[in-house]
């Protein structure tokens, strides 16, 4: 992606501001969400958010650019339209904490975009409301997701796991 493309500073400035003052593990989680968002914009199916014709045009542009095709053709207004797809189960990480971080950051990105005054909000207000609804739905879906098994449980001694054995 070229540094002059409008999406580069928009996304980078947002994630930099969000990470400012956070702990190192949180900053790493934010960076993983940022990379997933960039990958989504470079490879994701945008037909749901943009419609079939703009999505087909974007797909054609992707044939010429490995990265940044989204920002070559589209801008922040279209980003708002596409963010609900980024909250779909296929783009959410399996780990609940990572998924929660992604959902939270998308919600905060929508708020940051809403504060910008260089948009024609009459055009994107419905898409913004749909994206906010998608954030709320993703939060509800995540709450219904089964809890992750504790991966270090096998490292505990049998007596701590309450498994029957010669210690009993």
Task: Give a label for each model feature.
Residues 1-92, 96-122, 131-168:
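Charge-rich, intrinsically disordered N-terminal extensions
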């Amino acid at each position: 992606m070229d540094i002059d493309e409008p999406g580069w500073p928009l996304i980078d400035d947002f994630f930099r501001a969000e990470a400012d003052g956070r702990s190192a593990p949180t900053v790493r989680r934010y960076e993983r969400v940022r990379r997933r968002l960039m990958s989504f914009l470079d490879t994701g199916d945008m037909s749901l958010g943009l419609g079939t014709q703009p999505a087909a045009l974007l797909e054609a542009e992707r044939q010429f650019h490995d990265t940044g095709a989204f920002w070559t053709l589209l801008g922040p207004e279209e980003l708002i339209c596409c963010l609900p797809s980024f909250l779909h189960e296929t783009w959410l990480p399996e780990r609940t904490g990572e998924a929660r971080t992604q959902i939270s950051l998308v919600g905060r990105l929508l708020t940051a975009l809403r504060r910008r005054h260089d948009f024609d909000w009459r055009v994107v207000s419905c898409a913004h409301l749909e994206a906010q609804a998608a954030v709320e739905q993703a939060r509800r879906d995540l709450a219904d997701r089964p809890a992750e098994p504790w991966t270090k449980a096998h490292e505990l001694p049998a007596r701590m796991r309450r498994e029957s054995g010669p210690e009993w």
